[in-house]
Each structure stands twice: as structure tokens, then as C-alpha cells.
Amino acid sequence: MAKSQMALCCMSHSPLLNLPGPAQELLDDIEGAIAAAREFVAAFDPDLVVTFSPDHYNGFFYRAMPPFCVGTAAAGVGDYGTYQGPLDVPADLAIDCARAVLDSDVDVAVSAAMDVDHGTVQPLQKLFGDATAKPVIPVFVNSVATPLGPMRRVRALGAAVGTHLAGLGKRVLVIGSGGLSHDPPVPTLATAPPAALDRIVRGVPMTTEQRQARQAAVIEAAREFASGQGALAPLNPDWDRAFLDLLDNGRLAEVDSWDNRWIAEQAGNSAHEVRTWVAAFAALAAQGKYETGNRYYRAAPELIAGFAIRTAVCTS
């Protein structure tokens, strides 16, 4: 079988892209960068998409929180105005991928009924216009629910997935979704009130009123953060740019020594979502050297995020 052709697109996500509040200039600037990435993806025209993405207690909960999970079937939950309904997941290809990862000594769970939120669906909609436009294998990377595993295991996951994908003889796009520096209001085991605790542990569904209240809280938190108020950790553009430089220059192995506490201290608790970028770049790097393009970055307090985009193709 011929070797696969692979390409990559990593991008930040934010529920606030679909909510009132951010200035139109900011939204237009980000949309322009996304449009360029969309053109890159359209020109590549993948046969298969593999997403590495986090979850925000919409599909994975503390009753059983895997570090990694491959979905053999998946559906969007429809949070923050994103698509609700089944994705086009090729079950046989997904289970083969999971088996290959396990054979590579990386422990990964399998879900035959994976619920995915805006972290997975938003980039699919932004890049393809329709979350169901392409067959997709969703790979969950825990980036929120501590304790988290070491970064070297994330890179090992990506490398194992990429090695497997290289042998499929397809045009494969890998997507990493999340980051960069940001510290949005997310409940934790230590601080969550009873209702939120039931949700993040047992997966108790949110009522319509609770979803509306959470959305309003996110909008208010972003407004306060953009005005320099509130208790959220500040963005760290220097850290973000250093991370992007590491990726641009093929120094991915350096993340193996990163300490989880250091990441949170430097860039906020949800900066751990850069794990999805590490996994995606490791998957691409499994084919050889790569070159990045569509290099976009903007510190965006109105989105509570350092917002970045990268595309990449193999050069070897």
C-alpha cells in the first residue's frame, strides 16, 4: 500500500467566538486567519481527518477519566452554538487506530459512544463548514481534569497515531484543538459547588437554565478579564510564542521535560490544552521533517485565550 500523505492544522478554540462580547475587529482578524487555514485544508482535500482535542466535562467525567480515548462513534453535544448530532466516524479505521496505539505501548481507551463538545466540533465547522463533511476519527486528550500524565506520553500518543496513519495510503489531515495560554473559569474537584461536582464527576446533564447560566458566566468572565479585572490568570504571550517557536523549528522533544505544574503557573490551568498540538505535531513528525505555515498568533483577552493557528506539511 502507498504511504499516506499527511498535513496538519492546529488552532485554538473558544466558545466566545459564538457569543456576544468580542470586538468585531478581533473577530474579523481571527476569521481572516481561519479563512487562510481553510484554504490550506481545501487545497489538501483530505480523505480522513483525525482530531486531537480536549473535553470540558461534556463527554468525559471523573467517574472514569482516561488520559486518552479513541472514538469509534461520536456525536457533538451542541454546546455554545456548535453542531449537535453524530459525526461521520469510520468505526473500522478508528478501532484499527486504537489497536495500533496499544501495540505501541501507549494505553488508550476506546469509546463506542463518545460525546464531543466545541473543542472537537468548532475546528471541524470552521475548517470544513460542516462538522460531518469528512470522515473523522476523534482522539480525546485529557487536558482539564487533573491529575494529568506527563507530556512525554502525549508525544508518544501522537507518534503512535501518526505511525499508524502513515500506512493507510490516504490523504490524512491531523487537527489539534485548544490553547494556548488561558485560564477560563472551569470547575475542579477541590472547588466545585455540589451541582457542578455532580456534573464533573457523574456527568449529570445540565438543564437549559444551567447551560444559559454557564454561558452568561463565561461572557461576564471574559468582559471582566478584558477590562483587567477578575481573578483569572493573565495570558502569557511570551510563553505562547516560545511554544510556537518550538513547533516551528521541530524541537518537539523538548516538551518531554515540561512539568505540569510549571505549565499551569506560566500559562494558566487550561494551557494544558497545548497537549493536543503536541499530539498532532508528533503524529505529523512520525513521517519525517515538516514545515509550518499560516503562522497566526494574537493575545485575545476578550476570548480569554492566546489564540493561535498553524498549518504544516511534511517535507521529507
UniProtKB/Swiss-Prot annotation:
Q: What Pfam family does this protein match (any one)? A: LigB
Q: Which Gene3D superfamilies match?
A: LigB-like (3.40.830.10)
Catalytic activity field: 3-(2,3-dihydroxyphenyl)propanoate + O2 = (2Z,4E)-2-hydroxy-6-oxonona-2,4-dienedioate + H(+); (2E)-3-(2,3-dihydroxyphenyl)prop-2-enoate + O2 = (2Z,4E,7E)-2-hydroxy-6-oxonona-2,4,7-trienedioate + H(+)
Q: Which GO terms describe its biological process?
A: 3-phenylpropionate catabolic process
Identify the enzyme class: oxidoreductase
CDD domains noted in UniProt: MhpB_like
The pathway is: Aromatic compound metabolism; 3-phenylpropanoate degradation
The question of whether Oxidoreductase is a record keyword is answered with: yes
Cofactor entry: Fe(2+)
* NAD found in the keyword field: no
> What residue ranges are annotated as transmembrane?
none
Lineage, top-rank taxon, reads Bacteria
Q: What EC number(s) has UniProt assigned to this enzyme?
A: 1.13.11.16
Assembly with partners or alone: Homotetramer.
Function of the protein: Catalyzes the non-heme iron(II)-dependent oxidative cleavage of 2,3-dihydroxyphenylpropionic acid and 2,3-dihydroxicinnamic acid into 2-hydroxy-6-ketononadienedioate and 2-hydroxy-6-ketononatrienedioate, respectively.
Q: Which family does it belong to?
A: Belongs to the LigB/MhpB extradiol dioxygenase family.
Please identify the protein, giving its name as recorded.
Answer: 2,3-dihydroxyphenylpropionate/2,3-dihydroxicinnamic acid 1,2-dioxygenase
Q: What organism, scientifically named, is this protein from?
A: Mycolicibacterium vanbaalenii (strain DSM 7251 / JCM 13017 / BCRC 16820 / KCTC 9966 / NRRL B-24157 / PYR-1)
Whichever gene encodes this chain, its name is: mhpB
